[in-house]
Amino acid sequence: WNSGAWDQFEKTIDLLPSLDTRIVCRHTLMKGVNMSSTHIKEFAELDNRANPDFIEAKGYVYVGHSRENLSMENMPSHDDILSFSNELAPQVNREVLSESRPSRVALIGREIVPIPIPEAELYFPEDLGIAPPVKKLPLVQN
């Protein structure tokens, strides 16, 4: 365990609002571990510092190495995830925008704003530099 990991994590959280790109914070929810009202308040404090465009509340899945530490009972139902999301959303001045029951996920944010998708290229451009900022791209008109 890296003793400085939490400090680095907090620095990253505080850096996120200055980035000129869409930001998504993902919360992997584990029943009986991090879904209580106290945990929701703590998630909200971090989310308010990060000021993400979206928050993805996703249920833990009992696969891989995690099976050594957790059990099937730690997998929240979709209703559990929606309950968490509906309690978190007003604490971060957002709302539940979308959900997927088969994926056990909820999307929290202020609004869904589509961005243009460029035409596919059949070759690599000579300049593969840094992608342009997405928050300043024109919006897609419906």
Tell me what each language-model feature is.
Residues 1-79:
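Conserved AdoMet/S-adenosylmethionine-binding subsite of the radical SAM
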Residues 45-54, 58, 79-85, 117-132:
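Short, Lys/Arg-enriched charge-dense amphipathic segments
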Residues 78-117:
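A C-terminal junction/extension of Radical SAM enzymes
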Residues 105-142:
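Radical SAM enzyme core and accessory elements
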